[in-house]
A protein has these predicted regions:
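Amphipathic, hydrophobic secondary-structure cores in small proteins
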Residues: 17-61
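Compositionally biased, disordered extreme N-termini, encompassing classical targeting presequences
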Residues: 1-6, 77-78
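C-terminal structural segments of small proteins and small subunits
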Residues: 50-78
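Short amphipathic
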Residues: 4-12, 37
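Sterically constrained small-residue positions within well-ordered secondary structures
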Residues: 2, 14, 29, 63-65
Length: 78
């Protein structure tokens, strides 16, 4: 089942550390249970956002790649 995000954060063209900072700010705005889709093309974004999600104890729902773009879906759990 495909999860429809509540918000999408477009980080295409942004490089470290901007995708992580912007993801953190967006997660702070979400309500528990909502999902955030992050789109990025920085090669470091996937691992950086994964680390952020783990450190914030949120749920990494899925990670997908299409060409140079990574799509990361995060659910706020607390």
């Amino acid at each position: 089942m495909k999860v429809k995000p509540d918000r999408t954060l477009d980080c295409l063209g942004l490089y470290c550390p901007e995708p992580v900072f912007k993801t953190r700010l967006e997660l702070d705005e979400l309500k528990v249970g909502q999902t955030l889709e992050v789109l990025a093309d920085d090669p470091a974004a996937e691992s950086d956002v994964r680390s952020l999600v783990k450190n914030l104890e949120q749920e990494l729902v899925s990670v997908g790649k299409e060409g140079n773009t990574v799509r990361i879906l995060i659910r706020k759990v607390k």
